[in-house]
């Protein structure tokens, strides 16, 4: 989730999930106090730092391939432009966006946490309950956020997917769902 070393000081003492062991107790998967060291691609962050320090008037563009959320406070302040892709886009399309030939239309498919403490505070079984990163321009990197040439994307997709997070248990009538979707 981030490049630099981090110790999980605010993680739960006891994990929410865990398999039942042979003796009937639940496995504790807590990572409280565990230190994650620099990631193997830490050199990417160092290259970005170098580019930021030496680019002058040339915009620094970051194209980030992602498989999960990340903590952006190490990256966003160093970049003029951030493009997120999920390993499914063709590289020529990413180049076309950078060159201004194709307008970006994508939305974030998961929340981007403000920091690791927000990740640790998240309830794994509650969707979209995380405090999200807000960049220098005031954009919050929440689920279904995206920018195009005109600014923040506001279309049918964002109306559909920007619903308020579920914060309490809701009942679900499966029979009614089945009947409505036949």
Feature-to-residue mapping (PLM):
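C-terminal non-catalytic regions of proteins with extracellular/luminal or membrane-system context
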Residues: 1-182
């Amino acid at each position: 989730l981030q490049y630099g070393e981090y110790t999980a000081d605010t993680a739960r003492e006891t994990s929410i999930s865990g398999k039942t062991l042979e003796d009937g107790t639940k496995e504790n998967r807590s990572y409280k106090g565990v230190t994650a060291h620099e990631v193997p691609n830490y050199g990417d962050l160092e290259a970005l730092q170098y580019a930021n320090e030496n680019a002058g008037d040339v915009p620094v563009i970051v194209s980030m391939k992602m498989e999960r959320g990340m903590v952006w406070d190490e990256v966003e302040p160093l970049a003029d432009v951030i493009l997120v892709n999920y390993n499914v886009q063709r590289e020529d399309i990413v180049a076309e966006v950078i060159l201004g030939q194709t307008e970006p239309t994508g939305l974030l498919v998961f929340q981007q946490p403000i920091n690791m403490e927000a990740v640790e505070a998240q309830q794994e079984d509650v969707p979209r309950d995380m405090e999200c990163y807000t960049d220098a321009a005031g954009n919050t990197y929440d689920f279904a956020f995206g920018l195009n040439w005109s600014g923040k994307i506001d279309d049918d997709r964002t109306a559909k997917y920007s619903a308020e997070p579920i914060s309490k248990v809701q009942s679900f009538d499966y029979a009614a769902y089945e009947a409505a979707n036949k």
